[in-house]
Amino acid sequence: MSSAIVVSQDAESLGLQIYSRKEKSLGVLVSNFLRLYNRDDVDLIGLDDAAGQLGVERRRIYDVVNILESIGIVARRGKNQYSWKGFGEIPRSLDELKEEGMRERLGYSSSNNSDKVSNGCEREEPLTLTPDDQENSSSSKMDQKKEKSLWLLAQNFVKMFLCSDDDLITLDSAAKALLSDSPDSVHMRTKVRRLYDIANVFASMNLIEKTHIPVTRKPAYRWLGSKSIAERGLSLFNSGEPKRVFGTEITNLRAKRNKTYCSSIRKQIGYKKHDEENTEQESKPAASKYVFGPFSPIGASKTNNDKVGKGRLLEIEALASTYQPQYCNQEITGLLGHFTEAWKKWYAEVDRNK
DNA sequence: CCCTCCCGCCAATGC
DNA sequence: GCATTGGCGGGAGGG
Protein backbone atom coordinates (compact mmCIF):
# COMPACT_ATOMS: atom_id res chain seq x y z
CA MET A 1 0.00 0.00 0.00
CA SER A 2 2.95 2.19 -0.36
CA SER A 3 3.99 1.55 -3.86
CA ALA A 4 3.80 4.34 -6.31
CA ILE A 5 1.80 2.19 -8.63
CA VAL A 6 -0.88 1.49 -6.13
CA VAL A 7 -1.18 5.08 -5.23
CA SER A 8 -1.49 6.19 -8.77
CA GLN A 9 -4.11 3.59 -9.46
CA ASP A 10 -6.10 4.72 -6.52
CA ALA A 11 -5.84 8.21 -7.66
CA GLU A 12 -7.05 7.25 -11.05
CA SER A 13 -9.97 5.29 -9.77
CA LEU A 14 -10.92 8.36 -7.88
CA GLY A 15 -11.07 10.17 -11.12
CA LEU A 16 -7.93 12.07 -10.47
CA GLN A 17 -5.21 12.18 -12.97
CA ILE A 18 -1.58 12.24 -12.23
CA TYR A 19 0.86 14.09 -14.25
CA SER A 20 4.34 12.73 -14.40
CA ARG A 21 6.79 14.47 -16.54
CA LYS A 22 8.95 11.43 -16.90
CA GLU A 23 6.25 9.34 -18.42
CA LYS A 24 5.84 11.90 -21.09
CA SER A 25 9.45 12.21 -22.01
CA LEU A 26 10.64 11.78 -25.53
CA GLY A 27 12.81 8.93 -24.42
CA VAL A 28 9.87 6.92 -23.18
CA LEU A 29 7.91 7.81 -26.26
CA VAL A 30 10.66 6.51 -28.47
CA SER A 31 10.91 3.32 -26.49
CA ASN A 32 7.26 2.75 -26.97
CA PHE A 33 7.51 3.66 -30.58
CA LEU A 34 10.26 1.15 -31.17
CA ARG A 35 8.54 -1.55 -29.23
CA LEU A 36 5.46 -0.93 -31.26
CA TYR A 37 7.04 -1.06 -34.66
CA ASN A 38 9.96 -3.40 -34.29
CA ARG A 39 8.08 -6.30 -35.71
CA ASP A 40 8.48 -8.44 -38.72
CA ASP A 41 5.13 -7.63 -40.10
CA VAL A 42 5.63 -3.95 -39.92
CA ASP A 43 6.66 -2.00 -42.91
CA LEU A 44 4.75 1.20 -43.16
CA ILE A 45 4.16 3.60 -40.38
CA GLY A 46 1.33 6.04 -40.53
CA LEU A 47 1.84 9.16 -38.54
CA ASP A 48 -1.74 9.33 -37.41
CA ASP A 49 -1.68 5.71 -36.48
CA ALA A 50 1.47 6.18 -34.48
CA ALA A 51 0.09 9.15 -32.68
CA GLY A 52 -3.05 7.26 -31.89
CA GLN A 53 -1.32 4.12 -30.75
CA LEU A 54 1.09 5.94 -28.57
CA GLY A 55 -1.43 8.39 -27.30
CA VAL A 56 0.44 11.55 -28.08
CA GLU A 57 -0.05 14.61 -30.15
CA ARG A 58 0.99 14.44 -33.72
CA ARG A 59 3.65 16.98 -33.18
CA ARG A 60 5.62 14.56 -31.00
CA ILE A 61 5.68 11.91 -33.67
CA TYR A 62 7.53 14.30 -35.91
CA ASP A 63 10.19 14.64 -33.28
CA VAL A 64 10.52 10.92 -33.00
CA VAL A 65 10.70 10.06 -36.65
CA ASN A 66 13.01 12.91 -37.45
CA ILE A 67 15.51 11.71 -34.95
CA LEU A 68 15.12 8.06 -35.81
CA GLU A 69 15.53 8.88 -39.43
CA SER A 70 18.90 10.39 -38.76
CA ILE A 71 20.10 6.94 -37.82
CA GLY A 72 18.25 5.20 -40.57
CA ILE A 73 15.80 3.32 -38.42
CA VAL A 74 12.95 4.76 -40.39
CA ALA A 75 12.74 6.50 -43.71
CA ARG A 76 10.31 8.94 -45.08
CA ARG A 77 8.08 7.34 -47.60
CA GLY A 78 5.68 10.06 -48.34
CA LYS A 79 3.05 12.19 -46.92
CA ASN A 80 1.96 10.92 -43.56
CA GLN A 81 4.00 7.90 -44.12
CA TYR A 82 7.27 6.48 -42.98
CA SER A 83 8.68 3.06 -43.49
CA TRP A 84 10.33 0.94 -40.89
CA LYS A 85 13.89 0.08 -41.76
CA GLY A 86 14.92 -1.50 -38.52
CA PHE A 87 17.97 -1.69 -36.37
CA GLY A 88 19.83 -3.44 -39.08
CA GLU A 89 20.24 -0.14 -40.79
CA ILE A 90 21.99 1.46 -37.91
CA PRO A 91 25.46 0.15 -38.62
CA ARG A 92 25.31 1.30 -42.19
CA SER A 93 24.12 4.72 -41.20
CA LEU A 94 26.74 5.11 -38.55
CA ASP A 95 29.39 4.06 -40.95
CA GLU A 96 28.31 6.62 -43.45
CA LEU A 97 28.06 9.30 -40.86
CA LYS A 98 31.51 8.55 -39.61
CA GLU A 99 33.01 8.68 -43.03
CA GLU A 100 31.19 11.84 -43.82
CA GLY A 101 32.25 13.41 -40.60
CA MET A 102 35.86 12.50 -41.13
CA ARG A 103 35.83 13.93 -44.58
CA GLU A 104 34.42 17.21 -43.42
CA ARG A 105 36.92 17.34 -40.65
CA LEU A 106 40.03 17.30 -42.75
CA GLY A 107 39.01 17.06 -46.29
CA TYR A 108 39.90 20.11 -48.25
CA SER A 109 40.19 18.33 -51.52
CA SER A 110 36.92 19.47 -52.91
CA SER A 111 36.41 22.91 -54.19
CA ASN A 112 33.37 24.40 -52.72
CA ASN A 113 31.98 25.16 -49.47
CA SER A 114 32.11 27.08 -46.32
CA ASP A 115 33.14 25.37 -43.19
CA LYS A 116 29.67 25.24 -41.95
CA VAL A 117 29.10 22.07 -40.14
CA SER A 118 28.10 19.74 -42.81
CA ASN A 119 25.13 19.80 -44.94
CA GLY A 120 26.14 16.83 -46.88
CA CYS A 121 22.79 15.83 -48.03
CA GLU A 122 21.84 12.38 -47.07
CA ARG A 123 18.17 12.64 -46.95
CA GLU A 124 16.51 11.29 -49.98
CA GLU A 125 16.16 14.20 -52.24
CA PRO A 126 12.75 14.29 -53.73
CA LEU A 127 12.92 12.14 -56.77
CA THR A 128 12.37 15.14 -58.88
CA LEU A 129 15.92 16.19 -59.00
CA THR A 130 16.71 18.79 -61.52
CA PRO A 131 18.65 17.43 -64.45
CA ASP A 132 21.48 19.12 -62.77
CA ASP A 133 24.67 17.46 -63.80
CA GLN A 134 27.70 17.61 -61.65
CA GLU A 135 27.84 15.77 -58.44
CA ASN A 136 27.34 19.19 -57.08
CA SER A 137 25.05 19.32 -54.14
CA SER A 138 22.80 22.19 -53.73
CA SER A 139 24.37 25.37 -52.56
CA SER A 140 21.43 27.71 -52.64
CA LYS A 141 19.70 29.10 -49.63
CA MET A 142 16.89 26.70 -49.93
CA ASP A 143 18.44 24.53 -47.29
CA GLN A 144 19.12 27.09 -44.70
CA LYS A 145 15.98 25.84 -43.21
CA LYS A 146 17.25 22.35 -43.29
CA GLU A 147 20.28 23.44 -41.45
CA LYS A 148 18.31 23.79 -38.31
CA SER A 149 16.37 20.63 -38.68
CA LEU A 150 16.34 18.15 -35.89
CA TRP A 151 17.33 15.56 -38.40
CA LEU A 152 20.57 17.25 -39.33
CA LEU A 153 21.34 18.26 -35.81
CA ALA A 154 20.98 14.68 -34.69
CA GLN A 155 23.28 13.48 -37.41
CA ASN A 156 25.91 15.99 -36.56
CA PHE A 157 25.61 15.09 -32.94
CA VAL A 158 26.47 11.47 -33.57
CA LYS A 159 29.19 12.51 -35.95
CA MET A 160 30.81 14.26 -33.07
CA PHE A 161 30.96 11.04 -31.13
CA LEU A 162 32.06 8.98 -34.06
CA CYS A 163 34.79 11.29 -35.19
CA SER A 164 35.91 13.19 -32.18
CA ASP A 165 38.69 11.79 -30.06
CA ASP A 166 37.25 12.72 -26.74
CA ASP A 167 34.48 10.46 -25.66
CA LEU A 168 32.74 12.78 -23.30
CA ILE A 169 30.67 15.45 -24.90
CA THR A 170 28.77 18.19 -23.23
CA LEU A 171 25.64 19.54 -24.72
CA ASP A 172 27.10 22.99 -24.50
CA SER A 173 30.19 21.98 -26.36
CA ALA A 174 28.11 20.21 -28.93
CA ALA A 175 25.91 23.21 -29.37
CA LYS A 176 28.90 25.45 -29.74
CA ALA A 177 30.53 23.19 -32.26
CA LEU A 178 27.38 22.72 -34.24
CA LEU A 179 26.54 26.34 -34.27
CA SER A 180 29.27 27.57 -36.55
CA ASP A 181 27.64 30.94 -36.51
CA SER A 182 26.64 33.49 -33.95
CA PRO A 183 28.81 32.17 -31.16
CA ASP A 184 26.65 33.31 -28.35
CA SER A 185 23.32 34.45 -27.10
CA VAL A 186 19.97 32.90 -27.56
CA HIS A 187 21.05 30.61 -30.31
CA MET A 188 23.03 28.60 -27.85
CA ARG A 189 20.10 28.13 -25.58
CA THR A 190 17.86 27.05 -28.39
CA LYS A 191 20.44 24.66 -29.72
CA VAL A 192 20.94 23.12 -26.35
CA ARG A 193 17.22 22.71 -25.90
CA ARG A 194 17.11 20.72 -29.10
CA LEU A 195 20.09 18.68 -28.09
CA TYR A 196 18.41 17.67 -24.89
CA ASP A 197 15.71 16.03 -26.94
CA ILE A 198 18.13 14.25 -29.21
CA ALA A 199 20.32 13.09 -26.39
CA ASN A 200 17.35 11.70 -24.57
CA VAL A 201 16.29 9.72 -27.54
CA PHE A 202 19.69 8.23 -28.17
CA ALA A 203 20.13 7.59 -24.52
CA SER A 204 16.89 5.68 -24.37
CA MET A 205 18.26 3.45 -27.08
CA ASN A 206 21.48 3.02 -25.20
CA LEU A 207 23.45 4.46 -28.02
CA ILE A 208 24.83 6.99 -25.62
CA GLU A 209 24.91 7.29 -21.89
CA LYS A 210 24.65 10.18 -19.58
CA THR A 211 27.50 10.75 -17.23
CA HIS A 212 29.49 13.52 -15.72
CA ILE A 213 32.74 15.10 -16.53
CA PRO A 214 35.24 13.78 -13.99
CA VAL A 215 36.07 16.72 -11.81
CA THR A 216 33.49 19.22 -12.82
CA ARG A 217 30.18 17.67 -12.21
CA LYS A 218 28.94 18.87 -15.51
CA PRO A 219 26.65 16.40 -17.21
CA ALA A 220 28.01 14.92 -20.38
CA TYR A 221 27.35 12.06 -22.73
CA ARG A 222 29.44 9.12 -23.70
CA TRP A 223 29.08 7.06 -26.80
CA LEU A 224 28.51 3.45 -26.15
CA GLY A 225 27.68 1.90 -29.42
CA SER A 226 28.26 -1.59 -28.20
CA LYS A 227 29.59 -1.92 -24.74
CA SER A 228 26.29 -0.88 -23.39
CA ILE A 229 25.94 -1.96 -19.86
CA ALA A 230 23.54 -4.64 -18.93
CA GLU A 231 20.60 -3.91 -16.80
CA ARG A 232 16.89 -4.06 -16.81
CA GLY A 233 15.08 -5.03 -19.98
CA LEU A 234 14.42 -8.59 -19.02
CA SER A 235 12.56 -7.19 -16.11
CA LEU A 236 9.83 -6.64 -18.60
CA PHE A 237 9.13 -10.27 -18.40
CA ASN A 238 9.61 -11.10 -14.79
CA SER A 239 6.07 -11.10 -13.66
CA GLY A 240 4.81 -9.94 -10.35
CA GLU A 241 7.51 -7.48 -9.67
CA PRO A 242 6.98 -4.53 -7.42
CA LYS A 243 9.03 -2.61 -9.87
CA ARG A 244 7.43 -0.22 -12.16
CA VAL A 245 7.93 -1.94 -15.42
CA PHE A 246 8.95 0.28 -18.19
CA GLY A 247 6.31 0.56 -20.80
CA THR A 248 3.41 -1.24 -19.46
CA GLU A 249 1.09 1.13 -21.09
CA ILE A 250 1.72 1.66 -24.67
CA THR A 251 -1.09 4.02 -24.74
CA ASN A 252 -0.04 7.02 -22.92
CA LEU A 253 -3.24 8.62 -21.92
CA ARG A 254 -2.10 10.41 -18.91
CA ALA A 255 -3.13 13.75 -17.63
CA LYS A 256 -1.90 16.81 -19.29
CA ARG A 257 0.46 19.21 -17.81
CA ASN A 258 -2.36 21.43 -16.87
CA LYS A 259 -1.28 24.61 -15.26
CA THR A 260 -1.30 24.74 -11.53
CA TYR A 261 -3.63 21.87 -10.90
CA CYS A 262 -2.05 18.55 -10.60
CA SER A 263 1.17 19.10 -8.83
CA SER A 264 -0.46 20.12 -5.64
CA ILE A 265 -3.04 17.42 -5.93
CA ARG A 266 -0.42 14.84 -6.46
CA LYS A 267 1.28 15.81 -3.28
CA GLN A 268 -1.87 15.65 -1.30
CA ILE A 269 -2.49 12.17 -2.53
CA GLY A 270 0.85 11.19 -1.23
CA TYR A 271 2.54 10.42 -4.43
CA LYS A 272 5.87 8.89 -3.74
CA LYS A 273 8.61 9.31 -6.18
CA HIS A 274 9.32 6.22 -8.14
CA ASP A 275 11.43 4.02 -6.03
CA GLU A 276 13.38 1.99 -8.47
CA GLU A 277 14.30 4.46 -11.18
CA ASN A 278 18.01 4.40 -11.64
CA THR A 279 19.11 0.92 -11.13
CA GLU A 280 22.39 2.34 -12.16
CA GLN A 281 24.72 -0.18 -10.68
CA GLU A 282 22.46 -3.02 -9.94
CA SER A 283 24.82 -5.53 -8.58
CA LYS A 284 24.69 -7.93 -11.42
CA PRO A 285 28.31 -8.88 -11.52
CA ALA A 286 28.74 -11.56 -14.08
CA ALA A 287 25.31 -11.70 -15.51
CA SER A 288 25.93 -10.09 -18.81
CA LYS A 289 22.49 -9.41 -20.03
CA TYR A 290 22.88 -7.12 -22.90
CA VAL A 291 20.04 -4.87 -23.55
CA PHE A 292 19.37 -2.52 -26.33
CA GLY A 293 17.08 -0.05 -24.84
CA PRO A 294 14.32 -0.73 -22.41
CA PHE A 295 12.33 -2.53 -25.00
CA SER A 296 12.44 -6.03 -26.28
CA PRO A 297 11.68 -7.69 -29.56
CA ILE A 298 8.00 -8.19 -29.70
CA GLY A 299 7.84 -11.02 -32.11
CA ALA A 300 8.66 -13.43 -29.37
CA SER A 301 6.33 -12.23 -26.74
CA LYS A 302 3.93 -14.81 -27.91
CA THR A 303 6.46 -17.46 -28.26
CA ASN A 304 5.69 -20.76 -29.88
CA ASN A 305 5.91 -19.35 -33.27
CA ASP A 306 9.56 -18.63 -33.16
CA LYS A 307 9.40 -18.13 -36.84
CA VAL A 308 8.73 -14.53 -36.39
CA GLY A 309 11.42 -13.76 -33.93
CA LYS A 310 13.96 -16.04 -35.42
CA GLY A 311 13.53 -14.40 -38.71
CA ARG A 312 14.55 -11.10 -37.30
CA LEU A 313 17.40 -12.62 -35.40
CA LEU A 314 18.79 -14.45 -38.33
CA GLU A 315 18.48 -11.39 -40.38
CA ILE A 316 20.65 -9.54 -37.94
CA GLU A 317 23.15 -12.33 -37.68
CA ALA A 318 23.41 -12.57 -41.39
CA LEU A 319 23.94 -8.90 -41.63
CA ALA A 320 26.55 -9.10 -38.95
CA SER A 321 28.57 -11.71 -40.70
CA THR A 322 28.35 -10.16 -44.08
CA TYR A 323 29.07 -6.80 -42.73
CA GLN A 324 31.97 -7.60 -40.50
CA PRO A 325 34.61 -8.71 -42.92
CA GLN A 326 34.44 -5.79 -45.24
CA TYR A 327 34.46 -2.99 -42.82
CA CYS A 328 36.76 -3.28 -39.92
CA ASN A 329 34.95 -0.80 -37.86
CA GLN A 330 35.07 -1.23 -34.15
CA GLU A 331 32.00 0.75 -33.44
CA ILE A 332 29.84 -0.96 -35.95
CA THR A 333 30.71 -4.55 -35.50
CA GLY A 334 30.61 -4.12 -31.81
CA LEU A 335 27.19 -2.67 -32.06
CA LEU A 336 25.96 -5.50 -34.15
CA GLY A 337 27.40 -8.10 -31.91
CA HIS A 338 25.69 -6.40 -29.12
CA PHE A 339 22.37 -6.54 -30.85
CA THR A 340 22.72 -10.17 -31.70
CA GLU A 341 23.72 -10.98 -28.19
CA ALA A 342 20.75 -9.14 -26.81
CA TRP A 343 18.33 -10.99 -28.94
CA LYS A 344 19.78 -14.36 -28.26
CA LYS A 345 19.67 -13.82 -24.56
CA TRP A 346 16.20 -12.57 -24.74
CA TYR A 347 14.80 -15.43 -26.65
CA ALA A 348 16.54 -17.89 -24.41
CA GLU A 349 15.00 -16.26 -21.41
CA VAL A 350 11.56 -16.32 -22.91
CA ASP A 351 11.79 -19.96 -23.75
CA ARG A 352 12.80 -20.81 -20.25
CA ASN A 353 9.96 -18.88 -18.81
CA LYS A 354 7.49 -20.50 -21.06
C1' DC B 1 17.67 28.24 -7.31
C1' DC B 2 19.19 26.21 -11.88
C1' DC B 3 18.87 22.52 -15.00
C1' DT B 4 15.96 19.78 -17.94
C1' DC B 5 12.76 19.69 -21.57
C1' DC B 6 7.24 19.15 -22.51
C1' DC B 7 3.95 21.53 -24.78
C1' DG B 8 1.77 23.61 -28.37
C1' DC B 9 1.73 28.11 -30.97
C1' DC B 10 2.17 29.27 -35.43
C1' DA B 11 5.29 29.85 -39.61
C1' DA B 12 6.88 27.27 -43.62
C1' DT B 13 6.02 24.15 -46.79
C1' DG B 14 3.38 20.90 -49.48
C1' DC B 15 -0.55 19.64 -52.10
C1' DG C 1 -7.42 27.09 -49.42
C1' DC C 2 -6.44 23.48 -46.16
C1' DA C 3 -3.12 20.02 -44.52
C1' DT C 4 1.54 18.65 -43.17
C1' DT C 5 5.76 19.59 -41.18
C1' DG C 6 8.44 21.13 -37.76
C1' DG C 7 11.11 25.54 -35.66
C1' DC C 8 10.96 27.65 -31.53
C1' DG C 9 10.93 29.22 -26.76
C1' DG C 10 7.75 29.91 -22.58
C1' DG C 11 7.44 28.23 -18.55
C1' DA C 12 6.41 23.90 -15.71
C1' DG C 13 8.58 19.94 -13.29
C1' DG C 14 12.36 18.10 -10.83
C1' DG C 15 16.54 18.05 -8.33
Curated annotation (Swiss-Prot):
GO MF entry, a single one: DNA binding
Residue stretches of biased makeup (Polar residues): 108-117
Species for this entry: Arabidopsis thaliana
Primary residence: nucleus
Cell compartment(s), UniProt: Nucleus; Cytoplasm
Domain of life: Eukaryota
Pfam families: E2F_TDP
UniProt xrefs under SUPFAM superfamilies: Winged helix' DNA-binding domain (SSF46785)
Protein's recorded name: E2F transcription factor-like E2FF
Keyword terms of this UniProt record: Cell cycle, Cytoplasm, DNA-binding, Nucleus, Repressor, Transcription, Transcription regulation
Paired cysteines (S-S): none
Function: Inhibitor of E2F-dependent activation of gene expression. Binds specifically the E2 recognition site without interacting with DP proteins and prevents transcription activation by E2F/DP heterodimers. Does not bind retinoblastoma-related proteins. Acts as a growth regulator but is not associated with changes in the expression of cell cycle marker genes or in nuclear ploidy levels. Has no effect on cell proliferation, but may repress cell wall biosynthesis genes during cell elongation in differentiated cells.
A single GO BP: regulation of transcription by RNA polymerase II
Family listed: Belongs to the E2F/DP family.
DNA-binding region boundaries: 21-86, 145-225
One GO CC term on file: nucleus
Tissue note: High expression in young cotyledons and leaves, hypocotyls, shoot apical meristem, roots and mature pollen grains, moderate in developing trichomes, flowers and at early stages of developing anthers, and barely detectable in mature leaves. Not detected in primary root meristem, emerging lateral roots, pistils, developing embryos and siliques.
Region feature Disordered, mapped onto this chain: 104-143
Keyword Nuclease: no
